[in-house]
Amino acid sequence: MNGLALAYLGDAYYELEIRKYLITQGIRNVGKLHTEKVRLASNEAQASIMNYFLSLEILSEEEIDAYKKGRNKSHNSRKQMDMVTYQQATGFESLIGYLSIIDEQRAKDLINLGITFIKQGGYNG
């Protein structure tokens, strides 16, 4: 599977899961929903989550391969972020896209672990 195509899917899947999480937390103000969604789904947050997963050594070889497929693809980063952060975030999205196809529960479990990491101060955005 193409890494950038997986990242495309993973980006949408991750954002949907973040939005569902925020709604279930009782946030009703649209401005607050948007602010929290941006904080949890930013490239910087995704890169932090990915680094956290790697530090825990909880990913299988197949999952690491899916991450690398997205991370190693040639693409242009946005001006306001560095290339390493962009590559890590794209790799994270590729991993989530891959898992959303082959093991949706694992994708959700990792997303929930990432949310917990961010909420406990792993990334303050």
Swiss-Prot record:
Its EC number is 3.1.26.-. Keywords: Cytoplasm, Endonuclease, Hydrolase, Magnesium, Nuclease, Ribosome biogenesis, RNA-binding, rRNA processing, rRNA-binding. GO terms for cellular component: cytoplasm. Its cofactor is Mg(2+). It is an enzyme of class 3 (hydrolase). It is found in: Cytoplasm. The keyword Nuclease applies. HAMAP family: RNase_Mini_III. Homodimer. Belongs to the MrnC RNase family. Involved in correct processing of both the 5' and 3' ends of 23S rRNA precursor. Processes 30S rRNA precursor transcript even in absence of ribonuclease 3 (Rnc); Rnc processes 30S rRNA into smaller rRNA precursors. This is Mini-ribonuclease 3.
